[in-house]
Amino acid sequence: MSTEFNQVNKLKKTPRRNDNLNEAKFVERLIKISRVTKVTKGGKKLSFRAVVVIGDENGKVGVGVGKAEDVVNAFKKAKTDGRKNLIDVPITKSLSIPHAVIGDLGACKIIMRPSIEGSGVIAGGAVRTVLEVAGIKNVIAKQLGSDNLLNNARTAIVALESLTTLDEVKRKRYHKSVL
């Protein structure tokens, strides 16, 4: 009797923690692949580092970094790292950002401003990739300081994280009794 019960339990599929992330269709864009070397007393050990932006083009975006001995595994590791670092971005009806924002991280500084419908993404480098994968279609962005692709992508994520919607501002500003 107990053996039958154990067999039935083995057949049941347990829900996984990240199953809902696998259902959504994510877009992965490779920003950079670089060959890196670790020098030891035995010689040089080559490996590859991949920087990937992952998002659903509907308000979710993340940046991931992966390192492995071959390019394919580095890309896979970067994708899983990007899925772990997903953030939600508020997008307006005109597929822009709600307000102007400045992202600051290390030596990188990024200024983003909303733009009118039809203007497109006016940005360069990694910032453009992050905005496109997030699903933002009309925005103006300027990157200042460092031109490092990984740092600029992370700074763009910091800037997008600091965006707030009108409802969030109302909740912060007013007491619950007023709303």
From Swiss-Prot:
Domain of life: Eukaryota
InterPro entries: Ribosomal_Su5_D2-typ_SF, Ribosomal_uS5, Ribosomal_uS5_bac-type, Ribosomal_uS5_C, Ribosomal_uS5_N, Ribosomal_uS5_N_CS, Ribsml_uS5_D2-typ_fold_subgr
PROSITE patterns in the record: RIBOSOMAL_S5, S5_DSRBD
Keywords: Chloroplast, Plastid, Ribonucleoprotein, Ribosomal protein, RNA-binding, rRNA-binding
Compartment annotation: Plastid, Chloroplast
Domain spans labelled S5 DRBM: 26-89
GO cellular component: chloroplast; mitochondrial small ribosomal subunit
GO biological process, one term: translation
Function as written in the Swiss-Prot or TrEMBL entry: With S4 and S12 plays an important role in translational accuracy.
The protein's name in its UniProt record: Small ribosomal subunit protein uS5c
Organism: Thalassiosira pseudonana (Marine diatom)
Phylogenetic classification of the source organism: Eukaryota, Sar, Stramenopiles, Ochrophyta, Bacillariophyta
